[in-house]
Amino acid sequence: MNISELSIRRPVLATVLTIIILLFGLIGYTTLGVREYPSVDNPIISVTCSYSGANADIIESQITEPLEQNINGIPGIRSLSSVSQQGQCRITVEFELSVDLETAANDVRDKVSRAQRYLPRDCDPPTVSKADADASPILMVAIQSNTRSLLELSEIADLTVKEQLQTISDVSSVSIWGEKRYSMRLWLDPTKMAGYGITPVDIKNAIDNENVELPSGSIEGNTMELTLRTMGQMHTATEFNNVVIKEVNGQVIRLSDIGYAELGAADIKSYMKMNGVPMVGVVVIPQPGANHIEIADAVYERMEQMKKDLPEDVSFSYGFDNTKFIRASIAEVESTVYEAFILVIIIIFLFLRDWRVTLIPCIVIPVSLIGAFFVMYVAGFSINVLTMLAVVLSVGLVVDDAIVMTENIYIRIERGMKPFDAGIEGAKEIFFAVISTTITLVAVFLPIVFMEGTSGRLFREFSFVVAGSVLISSFAALTFTPMLATKMLVHREKQSWFYRKTEPFFEGMNRIYSRSLNAFLKKRFIAIPVSIITLILIGVLWNVIPAEMAPLEDRSKITISTKAAEGASYEYIRDYTEDINALVDSIIPDAEAVTARVSSGSGNVQITLKDIKDRDYSQMEVAEKISKAIKSKTKARAFVQQQSSFGGRKSSMPVQYVLQATSIEKLEKILPEFLNKVYDNPTFQMADVDLKFSSPEVRVNINRDKAGTMGVNVRDVAETLQYGLSGQRMGYFYMNGKQYEILGQINRQQRNQPANIKSIYIRNDAGEMIQLDNLVEFVESIAPPKLYHYNRFISATISAGLAEGKTIGQGLEEMDKIASETLDETFRTALSGDSKDYRESSSSLMFAFILALVLIYLILAAQFESFKDPFIIMLTVPLAIAGALIFMYFGDITMNIFSQIGIIMLIGLVAKNGILIVEFANQKQEAGEDKMLAIRDAALQRLRPILMTSASTILGLIPLAFATGEGANQRIAMGTAVVGGMLISTFLTMYIVPAIYTYISTNRIKKE
């Protein structure tokens, strides 16, 4: 007794099992997190080390090199990169996805602690920090006011908004963008300081001595004890202005005599505006695996409650909300599920033409789909675009087994058998076929489990959900479906009106197919050249279709990055960014929000468009319009970026090409030629390199002999320049219970050119004032401000933006060509960022594709007990791939992860049709028919089931191929590949498989 017979004999058991699947599925659905994609960012550990006053060369040789040397041996490292700059080095260790973040952090800490003995004694201890894979904000609350300063807004954002939002469940952290922290600014006048004989070091010492509060003990009496507190701290600008710096001949010199103190912003070289109004942005970062939509809803609710706590002249709005796109794209996919469900029901009814027979397989669809949510829950997945796409795809798949089972039982009832007996007989005959097609389909998804990197992590969830749905559907088809068929199906003496009207069409279809198949089998040799042409077509189209990681989506968001030449001032890049902002306002006056951010050397303008349904233009059209317009703004460089579908590197350009050499001189020599070729290449819209040799600097060469004679040491010179010019922290003060920095610096107007440095004085060991000009020589020079390593080599990374219509695959091909023309064998090249992910996913998908073919072949060989028969079925695969590529080529669809997964799926889908024909033909042969007659009868008898299951799969995916709205391009890519492959392969399979069968199938009669 098999499971189908058990279910027919015990209908309550079959019903209970189905209800349990539904119940667990619903529980899983209600507890799953919601996000856009699975987490695909690699674990990243950062190591930073400061060495005050050291230039990039010293940092590289004395700090970066020893640290890298030790870290390099840790297992599981994907890439090791570093940047050495004035006073600091930062090493970024990226691990493989399979490595646990905590383990990686502990390994790095261990290696760093071992390396510390090789570092300079007076450098700061290195710090190791984890970069959370999900640490990108999902939502920003913009705090604005027309009357208050950014300092006041920052305080409101920090004390009111941030404190409230941090308490929301599943929020990892809340940051403030554009924050202006209070500081006590000490502005110094070098001329007055020279007149009074005061140096910047004197001011630092005075602050240290006058702004101090130490524990002062207590007074103890017989009955009482009093704690003593020395009120040595200063809290206001007035107190700082009155601080005594020095006393000369009874004359007290205060800070106000040689400068002034004011309460101001610690960071004066940054700003942030939204729609032209200065603002600070409070951004919310979720915990890994959290439900992003629930967090966003909680933020909206909390902000509404907070309205009464905010001052009347302070308003808030939302700068961006990434969950809008997530909501919309998942809602679009959900509606696609319903559309697919309805279309599948219609196609089944049109073929079976009986509502009872239609209803039975259709019940399997919700059981399988709801059950899939329990699979997601057990596996720790989330509801995201990929798992929902898997659900859409399953609509057409899960019904196949139930259709075959129901039809087989129905045929027996029509012949006059009792429903109970028909159920047992029909289920027994089809039992093996259901099991074998299920194993075949699930086997296609096994290779995806072995895929590494980004694509592997992305599609593991997808493949698990489809495989889970198919397994549940076959279980339902073998248990609930036969039980239901025995209860619902009845023998009809007279067919319905609709059946009688449509039967001539189906009989005519059978006759046409029979005649055309007979004609084709007479000239069956045509099948061989058709197969060869198909393979050639695949080779040509595979290379012609452009490739990329994922199609670009309309996310209603565009970013323009601005960058000035090395050495440009903050004001220069600020004015340029404001020019770009004004240009954007003129091009898209109806934008929802335009946010500009500027810091020293670079800036960006982020444009949030209206929702897709509220505008008649696309994000891509706007981006192209802006790209053309900003070419006229030549004071600095600007580059338009549109966010890629996945990966955390949302701010970098798509092409990241790393040149590695053994010395920096080699890179300096080759980079201009390489970059010129990139600039001249029409594939790239813009290019830049991180390693610069054009940063202007003034080198202060100290005459050591002269300084020694005058009683001045090098440290005195360095400290005088540091405290006078660098805005160095001179201590801390407290205000309203919070700690803020004291920053000292010479007035901007008196340090705006190198000649101003000459007016700074220094005190020698005899207490005499000596003008700095007497001890030093100023030499203007250029040097790399930062030195880069990538995987232990000295490196330069060329970042390039792609021209309209170009893909990352084409960009990397062009880079490889330029590299082969320009570089000799002493150079090495590598990829980073999105480029590395793309290359790895391409090779990973090819591995999955080949493994899927091998697995299917081996499983079929085991099922048919033949190595020849599976080869016949495998011939359907090239037909399907050719169909997919033809549709992709004419539909202007790129070769991306979504379309490639569609192609891998086709292997299992089209193999099912071949299995039905070959297995039935083998049964006919074993019954005594010769090969030709057996395959002709099998193909004719299996025509309707094949057309019905193929049509249900195709119609289930039609809503994907014609998708609109948010996230449509991904759905279109997958839908077009599968629909195209299924359409062409279904038609050709009905002729090619019978023809090839007659040539190479196992002769079953001889075996008898």
Show which residues each predicted segment covers:
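Signature of alpha-helical transmembrane segments and their immediate interfacial
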Residues: 1-31, 430, 498-550, 607, ...
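Extracytoplasmic/periplasmic membrane-proximal domains and adjacent transmembrane bundles
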Residues: 6, 37, 48, 90, ...
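Transmembrane helices with small-residue packing motifs
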Residues: 12, 19-55, 113-123, 377, ...
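Hydrophobic transmembrane alpha-helices and their membrane-interface caps
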Residues: 24-36, 342-411, 418, 450, ...
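Flexible hinge/switch segments at interdomain interfaces of large molecular machines
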Residues: 34-45, 81-87, 122-147, 175-181, ...
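Solvent-exposed, membrane-proximal periplasmic/extracellular interface segments of envelope transport
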Residues: 58-130, 191-212, 231-233, 571-653, ...
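Helix-loop junctions and hydrophobic alpha-helical segments within the transmembrane domains
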Residues: 319, 326, 330, 406, ...
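Transmembrane alpha-helices and their membrane-interface boundaries in multi-pass membrane transporters
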Residues: 395-409, 431-450, 457-499, 605, ...
